[in-house]
């Protein structure tokens, strides 16, 4: 897991406001969640052939579709996989008022077929520590300006630093809970449409899922940290859910 066949290229300046276009296929765990009309509403990450992790607040249902292997949503020539969802497992501790424990697992009806452009991200251990200041990457098809009417066709990426929760509370106060992790305030920001997608950090040479795009500034301010579900705090629930299903 966590080692793309097609290597990502990060210029360093990388909403996803002020991000940049990704190399096609270089984030092979990134999926697009689309409703039955084909409208992209959230991102997600493949953690194996049968399971996708996303945000609970995305409100995914079994009538939605997981699209894997996609880069350009405006292209009809890509070898994408449209995968049906068998079951939605929303974390029972998810609180829609505080947006805490913002994680949902999707069990696929048909397994994804792994390839150069479709593969899994690594999950961290509950004990893993990703230090404040670590540069990580978030990806998605979310708005590139909060005022835009439409999301971009092509997958965007941005490098951004992790913050400590103590530091993050300077911006967000008591809204920041233990199952959240903040990143950004560095000239880039996740934005609407990125939700559910990955915040990944490299650990021992493999990209590891550290956060799930959750919430942030309503204007996708690049000087305010974005808030992500903290995967280390939720990974035990993930492993238990996979084991039981």
UniProtKB/Swiss-Prot annotation:
Similarity section: Belongs to the peptidase S1 family.
The organism's place on the tree of life at top rank: Eukaryota
Pfam families assigned: Trypsin
GO molecular-function term, one example from the UniProt record: serine-type endopeptidase activity
Uppermost EC category: hydrolase
Active site per the UniProt annotation: 57 (charge relay system), 102 (charge relay system), 195 (charge relay system)
Swiss-Prot/TrEMBL catalytic activity: Preferential cleavage: Tyr-|-Xaa, Trp-|-Xaa, Phe-|-Xaa, Leu-|-Xaa
Cellular compartments annotated: Secreted, Extracellular space
Official protein name in the record: Chymotrypsinogen A
Domain Peptidase S1: 16-243
Keyword Disulfide bond: yes
């Amino acid at each position: 897991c966590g080692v793309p066949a097609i290597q990502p290229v990060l210029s360093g300046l990388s909403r996803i406001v002020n991000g940049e276009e990704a190399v096609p296929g270089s984030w092979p765990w990134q999926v697009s969640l689309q409703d039955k009309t084909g409208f992209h509403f959230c991102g997600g990450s493949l953690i194996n052939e049968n399971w996708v992790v996303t945000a609970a607040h995305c409100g995914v249902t079994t009538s939605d579709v997981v699209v894997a292997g996609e880069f350009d949503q405006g292209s009809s020539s890509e070898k994408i996989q449209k995968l049906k969802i068998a079951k939605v497992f929303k974390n029972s501790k998810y609180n829609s008022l505080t947006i805490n424990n913002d994680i949902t697992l999707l069990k696929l009806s048909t397994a994804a077929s792994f390839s150069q452009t479709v593969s899994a991200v690594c999950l961290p251990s509950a004990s893993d520590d990703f230090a404040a200041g670590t540069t990580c990457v978030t990806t998605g098809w979310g708005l590139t300006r909060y005022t835009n009417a439409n999301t971009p066709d092509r997958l965007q990426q941005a490098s951004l630093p992790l913050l400590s929760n103590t530091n993050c509370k300077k911006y967000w106060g008591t809204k920041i809970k233990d199952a959240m992790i903040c990143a950004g305030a560095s000239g880039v920001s996740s934005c609407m449409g990125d939700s559910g997608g990955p915040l990944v950090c490299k650990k021992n040479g493999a990209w590891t899922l550290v956060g799930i795009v959750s919430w942030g500034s309503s204007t996708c301010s690049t000087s305010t940290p974005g808030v992500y579900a903290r995967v280390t705090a939720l990974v035990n629930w993930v492993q238990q859910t996979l084991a039981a299903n």
